[in-house]
From Swiss-Prot:
Gene3D superfamilies: Tetratricopeptide repeat domain (1.25.40.10). One of its GO terms (cellular component) is chloroplast thylakoid membrane. Signal peptide: none annotated. InterPro entries: PSI_Ycf3_assembly, TPR-like_helical_dom_sf, TPR_rpt, Ycf3/AcsC/BcsC/TPR_MFPF. This is Photosystem I assembly protein Ycf3. Essential for the assembly of the photosystem I (PSI) complex. May act as a chaperone-like factor to guide the assembly of the PSI subunits.
């Protein structure tokens, strides 16, 4: 049974209904519609924690999607799945690919910063303050870029940047 017919969550059902309407009324090439269907099913599976299924759908959407902007969101979501699975190196690869296609994707910059910050915290726990500082500096760079694109967002990151003296360096 297609995922679009299995949604139990109200938000997922609403998204699916709206997506189905858009697929019918917006003129698209057949490949674009199919790519969007896989993307939609990937998002639905991801929201339910079905990460393997989400990845299968996203990879299929990537195979079919030709628009770089749309591909950036698929790549971003693949990165999210890898982040959720604790595969931070893979996640970073996908966030970077998303940013190559769409440099104005603050959420990819934010998630990249979060991973850098996490790695900085790991370095502190391992007794390596120099490596930690390098990771924190990297996190600061990505957060500043994200904040520049979305000034009203990432308040915790803005506070961290101010508290640590990294804001505007």
């Amino acid at each position: 049974m297609p995922r679009s017919q299995r949604n139990d969550n109200f938000i997922d059902k609403t998204f699916t209904i709206i997506a189905d309407i858009l697929l019918r009324i917006i003129p698209m090439a057949p490949g674009e519609k199919e790519a969007f269907t896989y993307y939609r099913d990937g998002m639905s599976a991801q929201s339910e924690g079905e990460y393997a299924e989400a990845l299968q759908n996203y990879y299929e959407a990537m195979r079919l999607e030709t628009d770089p902007y749309d591909r950036s969101y698929i790549l971003y979501n693949i990165g999210l799945v890898h982040t959720s699975n604790g595969e931070h190196t893979k996640a970073l690869e996908y966030y970077f690919q998303a940013l190559e296609r769409n440099p104005s994707l603050p959420q990819a910059l934010n998630n990249t910063a979060l991973i850098c910050h996490y790695r900085g915290e790991q370095a502190i726990r391992q007794g390596d303050p120099e490596t930690a500082e390098a990771w924190f500096d990297q996190a600061a760079e990505y957060w500043e870029q994200a904040i520049a694109l979305a000034p009203g967002n990432y308040i915790e990151a803005q506070n961290w940047l101010k508290i640590t003296g990294r804001f505007g360096e």
